[in-house]
Amino acid sequence: MIEFLTPGQLVRNPAHPEWGVGQVQSVVRGKITVNFEEVGKIVINGDQVVLELV
């Protein structure tokens, strides 16, 4: 999935719906930086977390 993510896309973390919608900032070597509405910028390991496109 992470190979399809590009900066600017809107995503949601199904394990943490309370984070709200996030905008992908960058994708580098499996690490996805996302700026979520409710918690701010989070770096996610794309090998361990599956994000949903909004």
Residue map of PLM features:
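Basic/aromatic-rich interaction segments and small domains that mediate binding to polyanionic partners
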Residues: 2-54
